[in-house]
Amino acid sequence: MKYTHEQLEKHSEILAQKVFLTDRLPHFELLLSEVKILAEQSETGSTVVSLERGLLYGGYSLIGPYFHQHNFISVDSSPTSADERGAYNKSKVLDDDFIQVPITTRAPIENTVLDDNIADLVLVPNLVHHIADQHALINEMSRITKPNGKVFVFEPTLRELHQIPDDYLRYTPYGMYEIMRKVGLEPIDTKLNGGPFSAIGYCWLQALEYLPLEQRKETEAWFFNEHWPQLKQWDTQHTQNLVREHTKFPVGFSILAEKIK
């Protein structure tokens, strides 16, 4: 099924406002913008594989609608341990403007049952840190990608422990470069998102969740009305560490790599 520009824009609004809360969680602005760019740039009819976690959203692919002009295959890599938590985020997508694209299949990352060299583009959106077997994941990313095909990875550098116990590690872009290159994936474009001031805001948001409800409401209003706008402004104004060289403080990053073997 094909969707209109208006439908996709409304879907994007749901993701931004209800799912990713991009006004408060700056990590995911980068993810949404890059996915939409990749959808626009990918050749119509090309094969796009998304390795993601759809169980918690009721079995839907959040990014599937953007690839409605492609041969889109989504693989839910949620482990069996996630079954107990179930679709606990489904309420966030219960909206008429959310485009429901069901996950194609659910399979462990060690055995996705996809053919070798099937994908022109492989998407790994916010998944890497939820996979216990990193060796299997990185090899699968390479195995299913066609020679000269592309692999897109989005990962946070700053996150609380979440979806416990299925939260295993945090990469830097440079660590991701190393493991990608070992399986023939050469990074060709990297983007960083956020800075030290949005990191402060993110930590505040996490801390507020530990307060009792009434105190939380009062403190949230104080923080987001009086301080959050200033922190976001500083993040765009002050982008270089003036004390230490070779230092950055992103809250997330994306890498686009090409399969060279």
Q: Predicted regions span which residues?
A:
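A C-terminal cap/extension of S-adenosyl-L-methionine-dependent methyltransferases
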Residues: 198-261
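Class I SAM-dependent methyltransferase SAM/SAH-binding core
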Residues: 47-111
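A conserved beta-strand element that flanks and buttresses the S-adenosyl-L-methionine
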Residues: 123
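Class I SAM-dependent methyltransferase Rossmann-like catalytic core
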Residues: 1-44
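Conserved S-adenosyl-L-methionine
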Residues: 185-196
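A short glycine-rich, Lys/Arg-flanked "PGG" loop and its adjoining helix->strand segment in the class I
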Residues: 135-147
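Acceptor-substrate binding/catalytic loop of class I
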Residues: 159-182, 196-199
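Conserved beta-strand signature within the Rossmann-like core of class I S-adenosyl-L-methionine
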Residues: 149-155
